[in-house]
Design a protein with these regions (language model features):
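Eukaryotic tandem repeat interaction scaffolds
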Residues: 122, 126-129, 156-163, 188, ...
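Amphipathic alpha-helical repeat scaffolds of TPR domains
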Residues: 159-173, 239-243
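Structural signature of tandem alpha-helical TPR/SEL1-like repeats
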Residues: 1-10, 31-44, 64-78, 98-112, ...
Length: 266
């Protein structure tokens, strides 16, 4: 007998009602993608020990992977009912609800996760991604910034914060819909994304758009080209690079001839 699975199976053979052994074996089988066998042992665990919040939680995760969303929801709720401060249960339940397009309940659960665990980076991040209404602009921005404050190396949080502030679509104090792009902040966060992941093609593309707006054409061209180098079939990058080259006559500032050279032409 040489591995954990074999010993757990032996423990269950000796003591069939050993809840912890069924639970640990279920986790191993889940990791091995043996989902049906894992499910059997989670069910047995819960049958023996119904008030086992972590078992309900991990069973819910398994059921989510198995696309049994209804039963998954039931076990997330059971885990939360048994442990009101189970941040990860709220977090993963929130992700499932978002996948099922129940966005309000998803936001409620992600926010609850951050209330319980104020260092739950991913909960802040995914909550921010769901806060797409212009009236939630500042709240979304705050959640991205909190995620970044906890984990400065969170490239996706920098990227999506860059997109948010680049759009600048929000409600003014009187409720009027306004667009107030924060281009310098967007550029900063796109640059941070690229510094963390040099092959983040979308960050190069969006940074190029910012530079194009600012008429920094050489920088824009450089990052459009970089996006295409990373993802050759990036159609939007090809299109906007083409429009940039058309707009600038394909001659960038660095390529323009000097006055002396101009005089000698023709």
């Amino acid at each position: 007998m040489s591995n954990a699975q074999q010993h757990l199976e032996k423990a269950i053979q000796i003591h069939p009602e050993f809840a912890d052994a069924h639970y640990e074996l279920a986790l191993i089988l889940k990791d091995k993608k043996e989902f049906e066998k894992s499910k059997e042992h989670f069910l047995k665990t819960i049958e023996i020990r119904p008030e086992f919040p972590v078992a309900h939680f991990n069973f819910a995760l398994l059921l989510h992977e198995m696309k049994d969303h209804k039963t998954s929801q039931e076990h997330f709720l059971k885990a939360i009912d048994l442990d009101q401060n189970f941040a990860n249960a709220h977090y993963h339940f929130g992700l499932l609800l978002a996948e099922l397009e129940d966005f309000e309940e998803a936001k409620n659960n992600l926010e609850k996760a951050t209330d319980i665990d104020q260092n739950h980076t991913l909960a802040y991040y995914h909550l921010a991604k769901l806060l797409i209404d212009p009236e939630d602009y500042e709240k979304a921005k705050k959640n991205y910034l909190t995620a970044i404050d906890i984990d400065e190396s969170f490239a996706d949080a920098h990227y999506y914060l860059g997109k948010l502030v680049a759009s600048g679509l929000k409600n003014d104090k009187d409720g009027t819909l306004v667009r107030k792009p924060e281009y310098e902040d967007a550029i900063y966060h796109y640059k941070q994304t690229i510094s963390l992941d040099k092959k983040y093609s979308k960050a190069h593309y969006n940074l190029a758009l910012m530079y194009k707006i600012q008429k920094k054409y050489d920088d824009a061209k450089k990052h459009f080209e970089k996006a295409i180098e990373i993802v050759n079939d990036y159609s939007k990058a090809h299109f906007h690079l083409a429009m940039l080259l058309k707009e600038t006559g394909t001659i960038t500032a660095d390529e323009k001839p000097s006055n002396k050279e101009e005089a000698s032409v023709g």
